[in-house]
Amino acid sequence: MGADASAFSFRTKTMSHPNLPMTEVLVVADCWQREPDSEAVIQRAVAAAAESVDEDVAEAEVAVMLTDDAGIRTLNSNWRGIDKPTNVLSFPALQPEGEWKEGDAPRMLGDIAIAYETMRREADEEKKPFDHHLSHLAVHGFLHLIGYDHENDDDAEEMEALETQILAHLGIPDPYADRPGTH
């Protein structure tokens, strides 16, 4: 990513509630050390999203990488052909055909990458608490992993409404309320 990954301290946490996905958070950029509660914020946001959808995500796995603008720019360039940083990227896992059964190895929902500098700048510009914006991006990324998108207006409206509902459950105001032309 932005630098040699071996230079950073890697920390992980997982959720072990049986009806929620196991969420691993991997910190690969030093800038995230300024926000020591980021891992807990992400765990809580992913859990709230998982509880709010009809998808069976019990015993599934999600990986969240906390990176910097340089790292996410590389991912964005390599995977989307867009050579600039973005706030969040989601990489849904391709699942083999067939049903997952209890006792099988955990199924991977996919990976989410969140860039510190872009996310911090957006939160500051929109005058939102850092943890609220981080929660929003974690929820947004999770919804992409389970098939939601915003490629057209109807899909965007559906996804934004679900994000708003999930965030309200966390006590976070509607992130789209101040944007003209939304729901």
Curated annotation (Swiss-Prot):
Its cofactor is Zn(2+). It comes from the Bacteria. One of its GO terms (cellular component) is cytoplasm. Its EC number is 3.1.-.-. It is found in: Cytoplasm. It holds the Pfam family YbeY. Coiled coil: none annotated. Its main location: cytoplasm. Binds 1 zinc ion. PROSITE patterns: UPF0054. SUPFAM superfamilies: Metalloproteases ('zincins'), catalytic domain. It is an enzyme of class 3 (hydrolase). GO terms for molecular function: metalloendopeptidase activity; RNA endonuclease activity; zinc ion binding. Keywords: Cytoplasm, Endonuclease, Hydrolase, Metal-binding, Nuclease, Ribosome biogenesis, rRNA processing, Zinc. GO terms for biological process: rRNA processing. Single strand-specific metallo-endoribonuclease involved in late-stage 70S ribosome quality control and in maturation of the 3' terminus of the 16S rRNA. Belongs to the endoribonuclease YbeY family. This is Endoribonuclease YbeY.
